[in-house]
Structure formats: structure tokens, C-alpha cells
Amino acid sequence: MALRFPRFSQGLAQDPTTRRIWFGIATAHDFESHDDITEERLYQNIFASHFGQLAIIFLWTSGNLFHVAWQGNFESWVQDPLHVRPIAHAIWDPHFGQPAVEAFTRGGALGPVNIAYSGVYQWWYTIGLRTNEDLYTGALFLLFLSAISLIAGWLHLQPKWKPSVSWFKNAESRLNHHLSGLFGVSSLAWTGHLVHVAIPGSRGEYVRWNNFLDVLPYPQGLGPLFTGQWNLYAQNPDSSSHLFGTSQGAGTAILTLLGGFHPQTQSLWLTDIAHHHLAIAFVFLVAGHMYRTNFGIGHSMKDLLEAHIPPGGRLGRGHKGLYDTINNSIHFQLGLALASLGVITSLVAQHMYSLPAYAFIAQDFTTQAALYTHHQYIAGFIMTGAFAHGAIFFIRDYNPEQNEDNVLARMLDHKEAIKSHLSWASLFLGFHTLGLYVHNDVMLAFGTPEKQILIEPIFAQWIQSAHGKTSYGFDVLLSSTNGPAFNAGRSIWLPGWLNAINENGNSLFLTIGPGDFLVHHAIALGLHTTTLILVKGALDARGSKLMPDKKDFGYSFPCDGPGRGGTCDISAWDAFYLAVFWMLNTIGWVTFYWHWKHITLWQGNVSQFNESSTYLMGWLRDYLWLNSSQLINGYNPFGTNSLSVWAWMFLFGHLVWATGFMFLISWRGYWQELIETLAWAHERTPLANLIRWRDKPVALSIVQARLVGLAHFSVGYIFTYAAFLIASTSGKFG
């Protein structure tokens, strides 16, 4: 018999039903479960797939550059970044008819185009790109890197080039390589690019390979470095009247500590950014020489962890046994990586709007909103994934003997206390926050708004004041104009920083009040509940009171029959599945809050947010309903306008989202009967009965249907909000 899909599981390949196809797709990347897998092949497959991932990333970014160079308006945007709308790419078939063609022909284009809300124009402009030729060069270079990555992936699967398991488990060498080689050297290289290309570019000098060695980024070159006069590199920075991209008002400094924002571009000073990357490079280059490899000097990770035994024995044996546990579990390593990456991604969202690094991006409001929302959603999915792989670690890789009485074992031992504390925090936050919102709703409804319970966030305001915000009148630490820290800040460190905090034109330390207090606690409720579900799922993955032998059933089992008091919904997979809904819910509140607060800030009517955000009806009426009107008018009796694509996506997103419920609120029996009926009709219909299928159609398993439902729910939810966000922001600000 010919080999059938999936080749990696002969048991599954012989399944006579359509389960073969769906289970095959579901387990295609679960290399550990494949036939004939060895530890060596497992590591090699994952290693090779990393190169494939890199190839896809380089190809995608190459495509961005290529399409903007081919169909965009980068060169005309560079001449006037605040008034020309950046074009992402052309639209081949605008829907529908001539009105759509006219509506989407904008940004100085000859035909219908999409506007770019990704910030790539601002990014490329800031780092020194100026012409379409620059963009084409970048696209070709990334295409070349993509090809190299594919070749490297293939090469490392060939017998002579396969790394051994010991190579993959050499933690110290990997740490040194990643810290020094990846973070250190790349940060140093980026500092070099900023100093040699981007900073001269911001001062009107066009540096490329042909004049790279002739243009000194600093008049005295490397002289001050070798004579120890490093402070010279910070002298004569760009003036506050500097026009970005020209020599007007430009200085000569390359590494500064100015603080605050460039007055024209509203972004961080490029010379501050270069200084930051140089400092990061130094720290990581040092860090990458700390671990013991060939020369017998430096730290051994195992020795470090074995020595981590807390005094007094209150945490048992501390980190004993952790080295081998982590080093032998790819799920543990992936969980750690995802947790770190998730936090970093959320930090990127927070910092991209509050400390914009790219020239003029702060004045492109739709891009600001899109990037914040994009990075928060990405962070949510990555963070939930960390707990999923943490749970798989406990089921597949955790060895109780190896971890006796260490911090891991102790987490499992007192999991009841962890869950009950999280549960208490979630209940407290939920009932109190909802109680305040609903009370305020009722007061508004009865015409007595003065009876609302409005709580000033005095502690948060005090923290903002301590960092230099003066408007609250606390007169404490950096907001106290006669304190030593304040006076030092005037001259020594970041003199522009305190000015930036107290300007009302940016997103630093926004003024907060009772509406912020309430939504902050609503978000805290979402975070604590999501965490509770995820932590419970991971800590109960091996067993719970109801099902002590849970680990024998694997990560994602549907049920274990009626005899266990109802064991549906208690696999670690179910916890992940439920947590994703809460994660989406929480990020909904986060993005609603961010967007509404910023819309009112940008429009100059912050009182709308302050007055309407203290009760639920205010959010529904003055944020959601009021801002969806432009969107819904994308198509109207008078024809099509440029928001029509978002109106269509808004409707389509709702459709996808609603489709999810067909899979989420349903029973397998219903689907099985429907399938049997359709198959019966098919087999008895002339012509149709000439086509036979090899596999007997069966309904999806409970877990599979939940996954399909969850995917539709998530995608529809994000599509709907993305359309709302972009249309409501671009409809107001262009």
C-alpha cells in the first residue's frame, strides 16, 4: 500500500476516517510524538526549522521594502512627512466600481492604493534611507539573506552537518554566543549604523558605501576615544531649531544624554538612541564572557544553580536539580523564551507610543494606534503560549525525583495557596470594579451624576509626581523645583526629560483621574483571572484532587467518562483554551482604554474621556457607538468612500467571530448526524455518487472543535477591532 498522510505516524495513516487528516495536521509539528523519533533527530528538526522561520521573516520584510519601492511614494513622503500619506502598495481590484477606484486613489498615486499604517516609512526615514533605490537595495539584500537561511536549514539536515545532542545542550557556549554574538555585536553594529549613516542623514549628509570612508561622523574622528576625552562626543548636539534631514540647526555630537524629544519630529534624539545602543552593546559583550567554556574560567550554570540555596531553608533545596531539568526539556526552555518574549512585546507596545523612536511617527495617529494594538495582541498570544508549554513540561518532562524539595517541587506542593490567592484577588477586583461602574451607571440614569463614586488615583499620581510631573501639585522628589535631584537633572542627566514629562503634546505620564482608576482595575481583573486560569492549568497538569493520574492522559484529553465526577474541561489544554478568551477580553479593555484616551487627547477634548469613562454606558455610547459611525458609513446610499474596506472588514470580522460559536456551543452528536445525512444523500444522488472518498467522514473531536471555535473567535475579534480602530482614527485624523 502506498504511504498515506501522515508519514510520521503509521498508526494514524491507517485510520479509516477523516480523523486521519485532522489529527495529522494537528500533530505535524509535535515532533516528540512522531514514529522513530530520537532525541538527536528532535533537536535537529527544531534547529533546521528555525532557519526556515528566519527565511520567511526575511522574505516578508523584503516584500515590504519591494512593494513600497515599486508602488509606494517614499521619495515624495520624505519631502513632506507630515502631509503626504504613505502608500503601502497598490490595490488591483478595488471594491466596487468607479466610486471605489476614486475613493482609494490618494497619496498622490495614479491609481487605487492602500495607506501604510505600520510605521515603516518613519522607520526607514529615521535610519537613513532616502530613495527608492535604497529600498530596492534593502529588499534584494533581505532576499539574499532569506535564500542563505533556507540553504543553512537544508545543510544542517545533511549527515555531515548535523549538530550532536551535546552541542544543543552546551548551555554556557549558547549563553555566551547569544549574549555577546547576537545582542552585543548586533547592538554595536547598530550603533555603528546610526553614527555613520543615520545621524549624518538626519543632518542632511547622504552617506552610502561610495563615500562611507570619506565622511567623518564626528569632526575629530576617533581622537577623543583614544585620548580619553569621551565627553567631547556629547558636545554641540542638534539645537531645538534643528530641521530633521537638513543641516539647519544641526550639531556635531554623536553620543548624547539629552532626554526628551526632538521638537520638530517629536521623537527621541537620534544621538541619545545611538548612545543607548552603545551602552547595551557594552553590557552584553561583557555578559557574554562570563560563562565557562573552553578555558576553565567563568561561571558554570550548574554550579550557580546548585549554590542557590536560600538561607534558613525556607525555600527547601532552592535551585538544586534545575540545571538538568531545564537543559533536558525543550518545553521548559520554550516556556521561558515565550514568557520573556511576551513581556518584551508588551513593553514594545507601551514604549512605542510613549517614547517614539522614529521621526514624525508620533504625529501619525492611526499608525500609533495600530502599532500599540498590534503589539498588545501579539504579546497576549505569546504569553498564553508560555503557560501552555509550561504545562506540557510538567506532563512530559518533569521528574519528581530529580527536583525533590526544590523551587519547582515547592510550587506544586503549595499550588492550592497560589490558586486561592489568585482567585481571591480576581473576585475582589471583579466585584468591586463592576460595583463601582454599575453604581455610577445608575446614578447617571437617574439624573444625579453628582452621586457617582469617583476615586482619585492618588498613589499613581504621587508616583507620576515623584518622576517629575508637576500638574498635580504634590511638590515631591523630581517635581519639587528646589530639590537636589531636580537641579542635577537640569545639567547632568537628560535635561530635556523633565520638560517632556510636563508638555501636554505627547503621551508621557498622561494626566489620570477616576476614569483611569476604574479601567485600571478592570484591566487588573482581566490580568489576574487570565493568570489564575493559566497557572492553575499548568500546576494541575500532572494531577488534581478530582483526577490524580491526569499526567497519564497527556496534555489535551477531552474527558474520562462519567465515573470521575465529570472530568471534562480539566485537561491542561482546556485551561489554555479558556485563558485565551480572558486574554482577548483583557486586551480589549487595554486597547479600548488606550485608544479612547488618545483620541480625546489628539482632538483636544480630554474632558470627554474624563467624564464618560466612569460608567459603562459612557464607554458603550461615547467610545464604541460614537466612533463606529464613520466606519458604518464606509458604504452608504451616496456611494463608497475610502473607509469602505474597513466597513467590509468590520462586518466580515463579526461573521468570522460569530462562526466560532457554531463550534463552541455545540455537541459532536449533532455534527455526526448532519454528516451522516449529507453522506447518505450524496451516495444516492446521480452524478454526485460517482465521486467516492477514501475516508469515512466523522465529526471533529471535542478538542478539535474547540480549537476551530477558538481560532474563529480570536481572528474575528481582532479583525473587528482592527477595522474599528483604523477607520475611527483615520476617519478623524487622516
From Swiss-Prot:
Residues holding chlorophyll a B3: M662, Y670
Subcellular location: Plastid, Chloroplast thylakoid membrane
EC category name: oxidoreductase
Binding, phylloquinone: W671
EC number annotated for this UniProt entry: 1.97.1.12
Pfam families in the record: PsaA_PsaB
GO molecular function: 4 iron, 4 sulfur cluster binding; chlorophyll binding; electron transfer activity; magnesium ion binding; oxidoreductase activity
Keywords: 4Fe-4S, Chlorophyll, Chloroplast, Chromophore, Electron transport, Iron, Iron-sulfur, Magnesium, Membrane, Metal-binding, Oxidoreductase, Photosynthesis, Photosystem I, Plastid, Thylakoid, Transmembrane, Transmembrane helix, Transport
Annotated binding of chlorophyll a B1, by residue: H654
Cofactor binding notes: P700 is a chlorophyll a/chlorophyll a' dimer, A0 is one or more chlorophyll a, A1 is one or both phylloquinones and FX is a shared 4Fe-4S iron-sulfur center.
Catalytic activity: reduced [plastocyanin] + hnu + oxidized [2Fe-2S]-[ferredoxin] = oxidized [plastocyanin] + reduced [2Fe-2S]-[ferredoxin]
Signal peptide span: none
InterPro entries: PSI_PsaA/B, PSI_PsaA/B_CS, PSI_PsaA/B_sf, PSI_PsaB
Top-level taxonomic group: Eukaryota
Function, as annotated: PsaA and PsaB bind P700, the primary electron donor of photosystem I (PSI), as well as the electron acceptors A0, A1 and FX. PSI is a plastocyanin-ferredoxin oxidoreductase, converting photonic excitation into a charge separation, which transfers an electron from the donor P700 chlorophyll pair to the spectroscopically characterized acceptors A0, A1, FX, FA and FB in turn. Oxidized P700 is reduced on the lumenal side of the thylakoid membrane by plastocyanin.
Protein name: Photosystem I P700 chlorophyll a apoprotein A2
